[in-house]
A protein has these predicted regions:
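Aliphatic-rich helix starts adjacent to a transmembrane/signal segment
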Residues: 4-5, 11-64, 68-70, 398
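N-terminal pilin/flagellin-like segments and related low-complexity appendage regions
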Residues: 59-325, 329, 335-379, 396-398
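Structural signal for terminal/edge beta-strands and the immediately following C-terminal loop/tail
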Residues: 382-398
C-alpha cells in the first residue's frame, strides 16, 4: 500500500502580488521624485531671488553713500565752481578731458566733464536695441576737513598761497598728498593739482602725481587772486569720488573712476541689474528752502538734461543749485531661468508682462519695461530709493 504524499505549504509571492507591489513602489518613487524636484526648484528660485535682493541692497548702499557726499568740498561756493570744465592729468598724461571715449557702458558719455554734484545721462547706457537706462555721474570730495573752498591770494607755477592751510593735515600714512581743484569764473576750466610736501602756514607747494603746470584746457598761471581752491582729499588714502555708474553687458552695474585714482576702465559693482533710471528732485521755492518740490526727468528739452545742465551758462549753474535730491530706480533680474510650469501657476507663460519704475509719479515720469519671450522665465525685482544732496541743500542760495 502506497503512503499518501504530504503536500508542502507554498512559500513566496505570487506573480500578481509581485506586480501589485512593483506598481505601488513605482507610484511612491514618482511621488517622492516629484516632491524632491519641486523642492529643489523652489530652493533654486528662492536662492536666486535672495541673491538679487542682496545685490539690490548693496547697490542701494553704494549709491546712497556716494550721492549723499556729492558736492562735498565745493558746493558752498557753487556760483564759482558749478559747471566748470575739469582739467586733470596723472603722471603727465591727460585724464580729463578723456583722451578717448570710455568703454561700454559709458561709450556715449562726453569726453569733457563739467563739475556738478550729480548728473543723469538719460539713456546713455543703451547699446543698440539693448535698453539699459541712464548713466549717473557723481562728483564729491572726501577731505573730511576744509569743506569750504578758500580764496586764493596768489599763484605761481608751483605754489598756491591761501589765507591759511589749517585744513591740509597729513593723512593716516603721514603724507601730504592733498588734491586741490583750482576754479575761477574767468578761466576756461578748473584745474586739478596736488600738494607736494608739508605746506607752510599759508602756502601750498605743488607737485606729485597729479601735478601739471599746463593742462589740456588751462594752466596753473590761469588762476590768481579771484580764484578758489577746493580741497578734494588725497590720491591714495582718501580719494575723491568722481565716478560714473551705468548698466553694461551681462546684466552688470559698472562704475568708472574719472580721475583714475585707484581703478582704470569699467569696474563691475554688482550683477543682476538690467536697467537703471533716475530723476532729479528740484527745489522750485524762492528763496530756496532745500526741499524738493517736484521731480524732473533728465529728458532733452526739460532744462535738466545732461547737455542742458553742462552748457556752461549761468542758467545751467542755477538749475544745478536747485537739484537737492535724486531718486534712483533699478530693475533686477535673477540669474536662474525657470521652467514655465515652475514659474507660472497655470503652467503656461503669458505673452508679456510689464515692470514699472516711479509708478507713483504718473505717466510723464514713470518708466515701463515690457518683458517678452524667454525673459518671462526669470524673476524680477524693482528697487527705488531717494537720496538727498546734503551739501547742496546746505549751500548758500546765491
Amino acid at each position: 500500500m502506497t503512503a499518501p504524499r504530504l503536500r508542502r505549504a507554498a512559500f513566496g509571492f505570487s506573480l500578481i502580488e509581485l506586480l501589485v507591489s512593483m506598481v505601488i513602489a513605482l507610484v511612491v518613487t514618482i511621488a517622492i521624485s516629484t516632491v524632491m524636484v519641486r523642492s529643489e526648484g523652489s530652493k533654486r528660485a528662492t536662492t536666486s531671488v535672495n541673491d538679487v535682493n542682496q545685490a539690490g541692497t548693496y547697490i542701494a548702499y553704494v549709491l546712497d553713500r556716494t550721492i549723499r557726499s556729492a558736492g562735498s568740498g565745493y558746493a558752498q561756493r557753487w556760483s564759482d565752481t558749478f559747471g566748470c570744465k575739469i582739467d586733470a592729468s596723472k603722471s603727465g598724461t591727460a585724464v580729463l578731458p578723456l583722451p578717448t571715449a570710455a568703454a561700454t557702458p559709458f561709450a556715449h558719455m562726453p569726453q569733457t566733464f563739467r563739475l556738478a554734484p550729480v548728473l543723469i545721462g538719460q539713456g546713455k547706457a543703451d547699446e543698440g536695441t539693448s535698453v539699459r537706462g541712464d548713466v549717473l555721474t557723481i562728483m564729491g570730495g572726501t577731505s573730511g576737513s576744509g569743506e569750504v573752498p578758500q580764496s586764493v591770494a596768489s599763484v605761481t607755477g608751483t605754489t598756491v598761497r591761501l589765507p591759511n592751510t589749517l585744513g591740509y593735515q597729513p593723512d593716516t600714512s603721514g603724507q601730504y598728498n592733498h588734491l586741490v581743484l583750482l576754479a575761477d569764473k574767468t578761466a576756461a576750466g578748473c584745474l586739478l593739482e596736488q600738494v607736494s610736501g608739508k605746506p607752510t602756514s599759508d602756502t601750498l607747494s605743488l607737485g606729485n602725481t597729479y601735478f601739471k603746470t599746463t593742462g589740456s584746457l588751462v594752466s596753473v598761471t590761469s588762476f590768481g587772486a579771484t580764484s578758489m581752491a577746493v580741497q578734494l582729499g588725497t590720491d591714495a588714502v582718501n580719494p575723491p569720488q568722481f565716478t560714473m555708474y551705468g548698466v553694461g553687458d551681462n546684466s552688470t552695474l559698472y562704475s568708472y573712476e574719472l580721475l583714475q585714482m585707484i581703478n582704470t576702465g569699467s569696474v563691475p559693482v554688482a550683477d543682476g541689474v538690467i536697467e537703471m533710471r533716475a530723476l532729479y528732485g528740484v527745489d522750485n521755492t524762492t528763496p530756496l528752502d532745500g526741499t524738493p518740490d517736484t521731480w524732473v526727468s533728465p529728458a532733452s528739452g526739460s532744462g535738466y538734461s545732461q547737455e542742458e545742465l553742462t552748457d556752461g551758462s549761468p542758467g545751467a549753474q542755477t538749475r544745478l543749485r536747485r537739484i537737492v535730491a535724486v531718486r534712483v530706480g533699478f530693475i533686477m533680474r535673477t540669474s536662474l531661468q525657470e521652467r514655465a510650469s515652475e514659474r507660472f501657476s497655470g503652467g503656461a507663460a503669458p505673452s508679456s508682462m510689464t515692470l514699472t519704475l516711479f509708478g507713483d509719479l504718473g505717466t510723464g515720469l514713470s518708466k515701463t519695461r515690457t518683458i517678452t519671450g524667454d525673459g518671462l522665465l526669470y524673476r524680477y525685482r524693482t528697487i527705488e530709493f531717494t537720496v538727498p544732496l546734503r551739501n547742496v541743500m546746505l549751500a548758500p542760495t546765491s
